[in-house]
Amino acid sequence: MRRTGIISFAAAGLLMMASCDSLDLPGMFWSQSDTVDSRFAQSMAYNDKNGYPAVISDTDEYSVYVFTDFHTDGDTRNLDAFTKVYESAPAPLSLYLGDVVNSKDADWDLFLKATRPLSERGSLFVTPGNHDLYFGLWPEYLSHFHTASYWFEVICPGARDLYVCLDSGSGTLGRDQRRWLETVLEAKASSYRHVTVFTHTHFFKIDASQGHTSNYDINETYDLLHLFSKYGVDLVLTGHDHTAEHTVFGGVDYYVVPALENLKPEPGYALCRMGECISLTFKYL
C-alpha cells in the first residue's frame, strides 16, 4: 500500500511538472522535435547551399568567448552583463553551447537582441541544447540559426584553426552526423594548427551538485573519445551541466562551461586564448 502511494505521489508530481511551460516532460523521454538524423539532414541542406564560413583574425593569437545555458525567459540581465564584458574587449568569434531558451513561450528575439554586439563586432556560432528541442522547438531554432551541424575555420596570418559544431541536443549524434564528423576530421584535422569541437552535451561529469544530467550512451561516449584522440582534436567544449569542469583524456582537453543563467549564484563563461598554445580560463560575472 505504501509503495502504491509513493508511486501515485510521484506520478502526480510528474503530471504537475508536465503542465509547466518550462518543463517538457514528454520531451525528456521521446522528442517532439525532429530526430537527430532528420535535424542533421536539414543542417546539411543549409550547409550545401550556403557553404562553411571563415573568420579572419588579424593576428595569430586571438580570443574566443564561450558561454552557454542562459535559458532565456524574459529577463536578460546576465546576458546583458556578459555582453558588456565582451564589448570592453571584443573578440573575432564567440561560441554559444546551447539552451538558448527555457520554455515553449520563450522569446528567441530577446537572446538575439542581447547578443547582437557579438555578431556585429565578430561572429557568433551557436549549437542547440536539449531545451531548444523541447516542445517541438527545433523549427524555431532552425529559423534563427539555420544549421546545427557545421564547421568553420579561423584564418590567421600564419595559421588556420578548425572548429566543428555538433548537434547533441537529444543526447546523441546519431549515425549520419557521427559519420560526417569522422569524414571532416579525417580530411581536415591534420591541416590545421588547432582543432576545437563544441556541442551541448558533456562527455565527463565530476561535480554532482546539479544531480543527474543526461549524457551519451557509454558506447557512443567511448567511440567519440577515441575519435577525438585519433584525429588530434585539441579542445572539446560543452555545457549542459551548468558547472565548470576540466578533464584531460587521451590527450584532449574536455571542458564543461558554467551556465550564464540568471538563477545561478555564480553565473559564468569561459575565455579561451588561441595561439601557439591554447589557454582557457573560467570567468564569473
What are the functions of these language-model segments?
Residues V64, S94, Y163, V195-T196:
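Hydrophobic beta-strand anchors of alpha/beta hydrolase catalytic cores
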Residues S33-D48, A106-H194, S214-K230, L235, ...:
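Extended active-site neighborhood of metal-dependent phosphoesterases/phosphodiesterases
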Residues D21-D109:
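N-terminal active-site segment of His-dependent metallophosphoesterases
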Residues T196-F203, D234-A244:
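Histidine-centered catalytic micro-motifs
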Residues K188-A208:
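Short acidic, glycine-rich surface-loop motifs adjacent to enzyme active sites
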Residues M16-S19:
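C-terminal motif of bacterial Sec signal peptides marking the signal peptidase cleavage site
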Residues M1-I7:
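Bacterial N-terminal signal peptides that target proteins for export
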Residues D69, G98-D99, G129-N130, H200, ...:
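Active-site glycine-centered loops adjacent to acidic/histidine catalytic or metal-binding residues
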